[in-house]
Every structure is written in C-alpha cells, then in structure tokens.
Swiss-Prot record:
InterPro entries: Ribosomal_uL14 (IPR000218), Ribosomal_uL14_bac-type (IPR005745), Ribosomal_uL14_CS (IPR019972), Ribosomal_uL14_sf (IPR036853)
Pfam family, one: Ribosomal_L14
PROSITE patterns hit by this protein: RIBOSOMAL_L14
Protein name per its UniProtKB record: Large ribosomal subunit protein uL14
HAMAP family cross-referenced by the UniProt entry: Ribosomal_uL14 (MF_01367)
Assembly information from the UniProt record: Part of the 50S ribosomal subunit. Forms a cluster with proteins L3 and L19. In the 70S ribosome, L14 and L19 interact and together make contacts with the 16S rRNA in bridges B5 and B8.
Top-level taxon in the UniProt lineage: Bacteria
NCBIfam families, alphabetized: rplN_bact
Organism of origin: Pelotomaculum thermopropionicum (strain DSM 13744 / JCM 10971 / SI)
Length: 122
C-alpha cells in the first residue's frame, strides 16, 4: 500500500536507487497504490552515469509491497520491501534488467515485458 510521500526501492538498472511517490494515478480521490498500479515519483537517490538523475520526475509501476495483497483464491502475497520499476509512457520498462521477484498480478495488468525480464514471478 503506497501513498504520497512513500519511499520505494528501484528494481531495475536505470540508475535510480530510491523513489518517493508524489502522485497515485487513477482518479482525483485515489489515495493508495498496490501491486500493478502506476505512480508518479521523484528520484531521491541515483547512481552516477545512470539513465535517470536525482530530481527527475518519472512514472513507475509498483512490483512489490510490504502490505499483503489478496488473491482470488484466498491466498495472500507480501514482500520484505516496497519496490517499483520505472516505465515509459507505453508501459514498457526504461531499464533492461529487473532485480528481484515480482508479483503475478503484473501479468493481469499487461506489464508483460516486466514479467518476462523478471528472474522470478511469485
């Protein structure tokens, strides 16, 4: 469950290390984002020589959350950290690698490129 001012780790190789959520997309009253939701973020930490720089405003999709997500079969999935992948306007990732597992819910939201690049889909 991500809201405005939440800090997320970055799960790709764009050069960003930490993001801060500044907007949850999906309507004026939308308060929280979960796995598979798109958010607008500010880059708070970045490595030198990366694609994105500190202070850049980017769009990202949430791939892991500490708050559990309920699945249709009644099971729950949760992760040890909040993480996101920086995306372009066409929902494709800006990086070329994805680090760590991602949730299966991304497949239902048409983030197939992220799912195919991920080392593990849970």
């Amino acid at each position: 469950m991500i809201q405005v001012q939440s800090i997320l780790n970055v799960a790709d190789n764009t050069g960003a290390r930490r993001l801060m959520c500044i907007r949850v997309l999906g309507g004026a009253l939308r308060r929280y984002a979960s796995v598979g939701d798109i958010i607008v973020c500010s880059v708070k930490e970045a490595t030198p020589g990366g694609v994105v720089k500190k202070g850049d405003v980017v769009r990202a999709v949430v791939v892991r959350t500490k708050k559990e997500v309920r699945r249709p079969d009644g099971s729950y999935i949760k992760f040890d950290e909040n993480a996101a992948v920086i995306i372009k306007d066409d929902k494709s990732p800006r990086g070329t690698r994805i680090f760590g597992p991602v949730a299966r819910e991304l497949r239902d939201r048409d983030f197939m490129k992220i799912v195919s690049l991920a080392p593990e889909v849970i």
